[in-house]
Amino acid sequence: DKNNGGSHLFGLFKEVADIKTADQLHLPTPEAHYETMVVQPTEQQEEMVAALSERAADVHSGNVDPSVDNMLKITSDGRKLGLDQRLINPLLPDDPESKVNACVRNVHRIWQDGQEDRLTQLIFCDISTPKAGSAATPLERLGEQEGEKGNSFNVYDDIRGKLINMGVPPEEIAFIHDADTEVKKKELFAKVRSGQVRVLIGSTAKMGAGTNV
């Protein structure tokens, strides 16, 4: 039994290991300051949200074949729509007040303010990740479901391009997805710590626990 074997192995590990939690070690951690930014939906987003509700009603009533539409597809489309309407249709306008553009302006402001000390920023984005597919984690692939196939728009590239247009040097912006080996990750994290890379964009799966910057 694999589960019993795993439990036995963990039991043996605890016999020789001295396990301490973060609370027991009293490790110094910076105090986080949270700021919630609220943006208003576009007219197109409001219309598409209504369409999502209609699709959900059809699914729940059994009026649509699950192979055609289902709650997983609807939820995936809702996540994309909540981030940027161009993830649903790349031909829709780039709303100046969108979440992505609000993020870009904020990141650029902090980048300017931190010039002297070479301060760095991490941007987390779990959908519309670069190189979706073989390099993507299962969590990321949930954001790359039906409807995004063939969609040329990508949030990571959009943020990077806009920051470059606003004056951020290209070499100061990096994607965690480009560091596809432990050696490359180590080199990238060193550049972030030194301020050579000042904006690092990644997903929770690839840039969450274990990231040392």
Go through the PLM ranges and name each one.
Residues 128-175:
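Conserved helicase motor "Helicase C" RecA-like lobe of SF1/SF2 P-loop NTPases
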Residues 9, 92-104, 151-156:
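Phosphate/oxyanion-binding active-site loops and adjacent basic polyanion-contact surfaces
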Residues 119-127:
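Conserved RecA-like ASCE P-loop NTPase motor core of nucleic-acid helicases/translocases
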Residues 160, 164, 169-204:
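Conserved helicase ATPase core of P-loop NTP-dependent helicases/translocases
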Residues 129, 205-207:
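Alpha-helix capping/helix-boundary segments
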Residues 1-93, 97, 109:
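Inter-lobe coupling linker of SF2 helicases/translocases
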Residues 211-213:
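A short beta-strand element within the Helicase C-terminal
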Residues 116-118, 196-197:
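Short, high-confidence coil segments that cap the C-terminus of an alpha-helix
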